[in-house]
Each structure stands twice: as C-alpha cells, then as structure tokens.
A protein has these predicted regions:
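Hydrophobic alpha-helical and helix-loop surface patches within well-folded domains
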Residues: 2-263
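Short coil-to-beta strand junction motifs in C2/discoidin
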Residues: 263-272
Length: 272
C-alpha cells in the first residue's frame, strides 16, 4: 500500500490488512487464485474517481484508502473496506475475465457491487454488512428504475459516446448487484461458487458475454438461469405483483411499476 510522504505510515495499515485478507478470501471463494505476484494499492492526492481497478496497480482517492488508527471513525473504515474489496473483485471480474463489449458492463460492476458486501461480511461479521446492502443505494435504484426511459442493466451500446451513460450507479451497480444476490439465493451458495469457479477457469484471459456466465451457473445448479436472468437484466424497470382472491383461489398478476407519466408497457418478469 502506497501514499505520498505527507501521509503517516500508520494510515496505510488498515488498507493493507483489508486488502491482504480480501485477496485470501477471493482466492478461496472463487476457487481461482489471484494470478499476479503482487497487488499494489496507491493513494493519490488528486484523483477524480473514487478508485480504479488497474490490474495489479489499483489507484484510489486518498479518502478511499487511508485510515488514521485513532481518528478515522468506523463508518469511514467500513466505506474504505468496501472500496478495497470492490476493486479487488475486479481483478477477477473485469481483469482476469473481461466483457466482450460495453453492453455487458454489468459483468464487471454488478458483481463488484455484490462482492464487496460478500467479502467484507466474511472478514468483519460484526459490521453486519448485509443490513447496509438492504438499505444503501436501494431507494435510489428503485426510484430510478420506476421512471419511463430508464436503461436496463444490460444495455445496447452502438457508439463510443454512449459508453459513459452506462455507468449509472443506481442501475448497473445497485440494481445489478441485487439481481445477482437474487440468483445466488435462488441456486444456493455451493452451486453459485461452483459456477463461478468454472467460469473463471474456462474464460481466464478471454472475453465473455453475459450468457457465458449464466450458462455456467445453469450447469452448476440445474436451474433455467439463462432465461430467468436475461429477462431481468435486458428489460428496464421492475414488476409490482398484485394478489386478488376469487372464491378459494388466489390470483397473481404483475405489471411494470412506474412513477409519473409513462408509455404503456407489456414487460413481464419470471418471479423466482
């Protein structure tokens, strides 16, 4: 872990501990070892992004990496830990295996959004990270997803100018991460990890599309993941399910949930 000479050395200790343990965790969780001999984490005094997952040389804004052992509050430590775990997960999702084109950006960012919670919950169970996952970003994601014209998690990109619009924290990050938690819960932890291990082993140093991942999870679980998840990532919005009773039967129906004016929608989602 690196910083400028203006920083005290002890502000690097927390990041070093989290980074070291995160790599060990991912090695075991993914079943595929971190492929490089070293992982550098560099705090930059003037860095517009929060962090960037360059392979083997991750760069951070100073506030996203450095923690004073006496002055930094726990809330800031939790934030720093999730940023480190997020960027390190990209060493697998994004660097070891890279999406074929920008329409599958979610293969990088949705997974990193989920894995930062998976990793830090395992490393710091006393922080109860899944409580944060259930509240952080969710309201913004639901609000954004209820607007007409919002992009889907997997969105077409036909021109380089469209790439930057994909980095929507409410959709590709927050919504996508929670859809992955849905499929993880659906097929179970063992099948999920088996599918990921197969995915990394088969596609290491290659490019993939979303269906490559769904196929590995489908093979590992025996469940129809491809059709299920493509419906969720390829269409914008979210369903609201209504229940009505008729004599002794319950009738369930769904429609896309909107806030404000909107065009009619016939979108349907398979509910796992």
């Amino acid at each position: 872990v690196w910083a400028t000479p203006a920083q005290n050395e002890n502000t690097l200790d927390f990041a070093l501990d989290i980074a070291t343990r995160s790599i060990d965790f991912y090695d075991e969780y993914f079943g595929v070892k971190y492929p490089l001999p070293k992982s550098n984490h560099v705090a930059l005094p003037d860095f517009s992004s929060g962090a960037m997952e360059n392979w083997g040389l991750i760069t951070y804004r100073e506030s996203c990496l450095l923690a004073d052992p006496e002055l930094t509050p726990e809330s800031s430590r939790r934030f720093i830990a999730t940023v480190i775990a997020h960027e390190l997960s990209h060493q697998w999702f994004g660097n070891l295996v890279t999406m074929q084109w920008w329409n599958d950006l979610w293969l990088n960012e949705s997974f990193a959004n989920m894995m930062e919670y998976v990793a830090i919950d395992a490393l710091q169970p006393d922080w109860h990270m899944w409580e944060d996952f259930a509240t952080n970003e969710v309201t913004a994601a639901l609000r954004r997803d209820s607007l007409d014209g919002v992009q889907s998690v997997q969105a077409d990109v036909n021109h380089p100018d469209e790439i930057s619009t994909l980095f929507d924290p409410a959709i590709v990050y927050a919504k996508g991460g929670r859809l992955l938690v849905m499929v993880r819960k659906l097929i179970g932890e063992e099948a999920f990890r088996t599918g990921l291990k197969s995915y990394f082993e088969k596609f290491a140093y290659k490019n993939t599309v979303g269906n490559d991942l769904w196929q590995e999870l489908e093979s590992a679980s025996g469940q129809p993941i491809i059709n299920l998840m493509n419906a969720w990532i390829s269409q914008p919005g979210l369903p609201v399910v209504s229940v009505s009773s008729s004599h002794d039967a319950a009738i369930l129906s769904q429609e896309r949930f909107f806030i404000g004016e909107h065009q009619p929608s016939d979108a349907l989602w398979p509910i796992p």
